[in-house]
Design a protein with these regions (language model features):
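C-terminal motif of bacterial Sec signal peptides marking the signal peptidase cleavage site
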Residues: 28-31
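Bacterial signal peptide processing site
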Residues: 33-35
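Conserved hydrophobic/amphipathic alpha-helical signal-anchor segments
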Residues: 42-65, 138-188
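Surface-exposed, charged secondary-structure patches
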Residues: 72-119, 225, 229-232, 242-244, ...
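Short beta-strand edge/turn micro-motifs at domain boundaries
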Residues: 108-151, 155-158, 287-292
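C-terminal soluble interaction/assembly domains
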Residues: 261-317
Length: 317
């Protein structure tokens, strides 16, 4: 797993270690980006499982689609290409650690890794042999993906709270004020965001680059504009004010250009219903709330200006 804060994420990782291993089972599908090929049928469930292992080791898109069938193309992306790649590598590692086929009623399951995790796509009897039933495994794969991403996002928001508190413990711009960061990525040569490129011998920034790049607006560095990409399926935005339903009532966190009154963050899925369902918010109090914003999640979350958890938001912890 990627380390994205200096200390806090190491303390939080144990909360979702098991969920991470589960995710490795389906993240291997993200390698399948080429045109679908004809689905293979095999003489036995064991042969089907061996074919999947061979395709994983080869790293071939065509071979994976040939084993899993064209339906697998719909399941190839979690919304985070970097994390998908890591997941594929760990899936292969788990397969190499241990793999076996077990019967479950009229179907067979491939079980991999030292913790005996079942691959979510069962092997079933077809007219001419045995094949992976990708269509029936779709719901399970999406449930695992969404559940994993949402658990990670809750912990990420708590880590951002820790990072903001750490940031505010020092005067970052020499104005003798302790303040929170208004953005994730600092301008070149400055420390006005939660992430900056550390110089040799310098203390690391409160968050790491991968999370910083998940800010929804993208960012500019050295006159180059970079598009945002999601962090484990989610985008993040810093909010600078709160509304009537927040504890303490409505007020701006920014006073005379300095964010000293508090902070808030919203995290929302990059692909609604695929990389996640719930949108999450948190402020300086450290309590995470969640809500399903529906099919217009991207637009609603991008337009969100206030931290304002009314009774349609429920605690996520």
């Amino acid at each position: 797993m990627f380390s994205f804060t200096k200390n806090s994420i190491q303390k939080r990782q144990y909360f979702f270690t098991i969920a991470t291993l589960v995710a490795f089972l389906w993240l291997s599908l993200a390698a399948c980006t080429s045109a679908p090929s004809k689905k293979n049928e095999f003489k036995s469930p064991d042969e089907a499982a061996q074919a999947l292992g061979t395709a994983l080791k080869a790293g071939s898109n065509e071979e994976l689609l040939a084993v899993l069938g064209p339906e697998a193309k719909e399941l190839i992306s979690s919304g985070d290409e970097v994390y998908d790649l890591q997941g594929r590598q760990n899936c292969l590692k788990a397969y190499d650690e241990q793999n076996r086929v077990e019967q479950d009623g009229d179907k067979f399951l491939l079980v991999i890794g030292k913790n005996d995790w079942p691959f979510p796509i069962p092997i079933v009897k077809k007219e001419n042999g045995w094949a992976f039933d990708t269509a029936s495994g779709k719901e399970e794969i999406l449930n695992r993906r969404i559940g994993k991403n949402e658990l990670d996002t809750i912990q990420t928001l708590l880590a951002i709270v820790d990072a903001q508190r750490e940031y505010a413990m020092a005067d970052r711009d020499g104005d003798s004020l302790l303040e929170y960061a208004r953005k994730f990525i600092s301008e070149s040569g400055k420390k006005d965001g939660l992430y900056w490129t550390p110089q040799e011998g310098e203390e690391p920034s409160p968050i790491g680059e991968l999370l910083a790049n998940a800010q929804a607006e993208g960012y500019a560095s050295d006159e180059t504009l970079y598009d945002p990409w999601p962090y484990r399926g989610y985008y993040y935005r810093i909010l600078t004010a709160q509304g009537n339903k927040a504890a303490g009532g409505p007020y701006d966190y920014i006073v005379d250009g300095k964010m000293i009154g508090g902070f808030a963050v919203v995290a929302y899925p990059a692909e609604q219903g695929n990389s996640g369902v719930m949108t999450f918010i948190v402020n300086h109090d450290g309590k995470v709330y969640q809500k399903d914003l529906g099919e217009n999640t991207l637009e609603l979350a991008k337009d969100m200006a206030l931290y304002d958890p009314d009774d349609t938001w429920t605690p996520a912890q």
